Amino acid sequence: MSEYRIEHDSMGEVRVPADAKWRAQTQRAVENFPVSGQRIERAHIEALARIKSAAAKVNAELGVLDEDVAGAIQEAAGEVAEGKWDEHFPVDVFQTGSGTSSNMNTNEVVATLATERLGRDVHPNDHVNASQSSNDVFPSSIHIAATAAVTRDLIPALDHLAGALERKAGEFADVVKSGRTHLMDATPVTLGQEFGGYAAQVRYGIERLQASLPRLAELPLGGTAVGTGINTPPGFSAAVIEEVARATGLPLTEARDHFEAQGARDGIVETSGQLRTIGVGLTKIANDLRWMASGPRTGLAEISLPDLQPGSSIMPGKVNPVIPEAVLMVAAQVTGNDATVAAAGAAGNFELNVMLPVIAKNVLESVRLLANVSRLLADRTVDGIVAHPERAREYAESSPSVVTPLNKYLGYEEAAKVAKRALAERKTIRQTVLEGGYVERGDLTREQLDQALDVLRMTRP
């Protein structure tokens, strides 16, 4: 039996692997783009298939396709959406900028599967791609996949992380520690206040995503080649988007302006920026956790993180903050992905952006990485954090910054002298004030001194 079969397209004949569900145009793309070995994301394949199914249904309702052909296409597209044929999507991410190769890959696989079901030919262009163009289908598929990933994966993952941080904020509400600005001692805070701040960062990330969703969920579907809707029957655009929204359960809407929606990718660029902001926030959180857990003997050691794996191939007993480090790498990747999306988003000329596949790859990867690492950070680090209250309080009470409440009794300059003397003589602020005769002179009473130097009270003025 031959290892190949002959397929043809408008450019002629092409040899295709005998068992491949794709056809000529996909094979040409495979041969033209052996670039990275990276294929489009699973979520993206699903989104393309959802469009093909919805389009077939609406085309049948509008008299463009026969019912049996449309039914076969819907069944085939359903299997593709479920992931049963992912190995038949071999086209590299770095391909034609409109995503035509991946759109045709979808058309051809669905056409082959539908032909097998129907017993007669289903054409990838005339039937599966009816009333469509790569120029409206592919950007729509990006927005569908990204909307699904953000709403179903990333937002729940961030909510999970925020909840873990909020629980720790409550647990550590009375654990007083030295505040730090510029990595230098500052007035006291509680560990709970810091964790509450981290939780708020994550919650605000969710708010940012939700704010960008209305534009992310707008689809140019139905605009076909240049946004005019040429070759579509009346009512197709609204009907097909309504069907995709129904089938996916996503809050998808028709683009308010099809020319903006095909010529520009501002909605997805905006979302990528929100993803970068979330990554920046996670970087801050992860670094703070690493600093507070540094040690065990020569660092801050205010908290302990769960021990997850040996940290060194040469130093026995060493354990490292591996999850926070993974978070930092994800954040760096997301920042780089956003730079790519920004550059690619600027690549629109007239009626079409021509860097769509790389936009899709980077945005969907960012969502996936952030969602995964947020869950890991919550489950394998935050939930297991243990505070060391005595150590934290010792730092807070020994910090020269606790002199700050004495400003109103001694004045700023005299309080500064106290702080410098305490540092130079390696004494506490309390010792220095008492030995300096400030109480004896009547600058303040011992009771006022006690209240002023109550480090927990300083966190709740």
Curated annotation (Swiss-Prot):
One of the Pfam families matching this protein, by short name: Lyase_1
Keywords annotated in UniProt: Cytoplasm, Lyase, Tricarboxylic acid cycle
InterPro entries membership: Fum_hydII (IPR005677), Fumarase/histidase_N (IPR024083), Fumarase_C_C (IPR018951), Fumarate_lyase_CS (IPR020557), Fumarate_lyase_fam (IPR000362), Fumarate_lyase_N (IPR022761), L-Aspartase-like (IPR008948)
CDD domains membership: Fumarase_classII (cd01362)
A biological process from GO: fumarate metabolic process
Residues annotated as signal peptide: none
Residue numbers marked as site, Important for catalytic activity: E325
Subcellular location: Cytoplasm
Active site (UniProt): H182, S312
Pathway: Carbohydrate metabolism; tricarboxylic acid cycle; (S)-malate from fumarate: step 1/1
GO molecular function terms listed in the Swiss-Prot or TrEMBL record: fumarate hydratase activity
EC number(s) recorded for this UniProt protein: 4.2.1.2
GO cellular component: cytoplasm
Chain sites annotated for binding substrate: 98-100, 120, 123-126, 133-135, 181, 313, 318-320
Keyword Acetylation: no
Catalytic activity: (S)-malate = fumarate + H2O
Miscellaneous information on this protein: There are 2 substrate-binding sites: the catalytic A site, and the non-catalytic B site that may play a role in the transfer of substrate or product between the active site and the solvent. Alternatively, the B site may bind allosteric effectors.
Function field: Involved in the TCA cycle. Catalyzes the stereospecific interconversion of fumarate to L-malate.
Family: Belongs to the class-II fumarase/aspartase family. Fumarase subfamily.
Matching NCBIfam families: PRK12273.1
Subunit structure: Homotetramer.
Name this polypeptide is given: Fumarate hydratase class II
